[in-house]
Amino acid sequence: MIDISNWDYYHKLNPNGTPYPSNLLYTPRVNPEQTVMCAHYCIDPAYRPKETILVPQELVDWFFERDVKFLKELSHLKTTPMLYDVDYDNRKIFIEWNKETLSQVLFTPGRDLDTEVPNWKEQMKDFFISTKENNFWKVSLYPNCFFISKDGQLKTIDNYAVIPYEERFIERKIIEGIIGKDGAYRFDLSTDEKGFIDFKKFFEITITKHLQEKSWGNTVFADIFEEVYND
């Protein structure tokens, strides 16, 4: 078992530059060398002292299993971080890491993503092409869901948010406990009369509208959608 007692929490940066817990499902800790991230799927009030949404443990476990599953199944993609180890008993996933996510680059005053990673848009487009070629959507696409590896390769974390085309419709009640108010409209617009979320529709809303308004502040993803999915 890997000892993470001296590993630091990772916090994303919000668009206003303030640090904030990166997600509701796992507690991210980074080793002193900043080369490995442990995603500990647990309810950790110390990491989220102000959080009002408490995700049920069974839902946390469900997403843990999906994260492991897709880290393995998509390991052939260059955007998938290397999976080092999985502690199934304690629900810990150890993956490749490199200091920070793109939220630090985007929302730290004086830093510029286009300058630091000139080809990030091309890499992002390549990522979406690979999702289409491999028949899945990834719906967690905030800046804190991406980092740049030591060799300059775009990597994406939070693979619990991978939806294979064959799982296009998922019953909303299964994941209701993770739906926050800021993004609830996407779920509302994508839920059919039988209570199933259409993730094809959800993905389109996310990539053409939500990301621009809520995080990235640009039209890059909407442009990529037009190029990749409407060819």
Where are these regions (language model features)?
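Juxta-kinase regulatory segment immediately upstream of eukaryotic protein kinase catalytic domains
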Residues: M1-Y20
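ATP-binding glycine-rich loop module of kinase domains
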Residues: Y10-K12, P21-F70
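Conserved hydrophobic "DFG−1" position in protein kinase catalytic cores
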Residues: P28, I95-W97, F147-S149
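Conserved structural core of kinase catalytic domains
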Residues: V60, T79-P118
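Structural motif at the C-terminus of the N-lobe alphaC helix and the adjacent alphaC-beta4 loop
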Residues: K69-K78
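Conserved alphaE helix
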Residues: T115-F127
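Catalytic-loop of the protein kinase fold
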Residues: K132-I148
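C-lobe/activation-segment region of protein kinase-like
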Residues: S149-D231
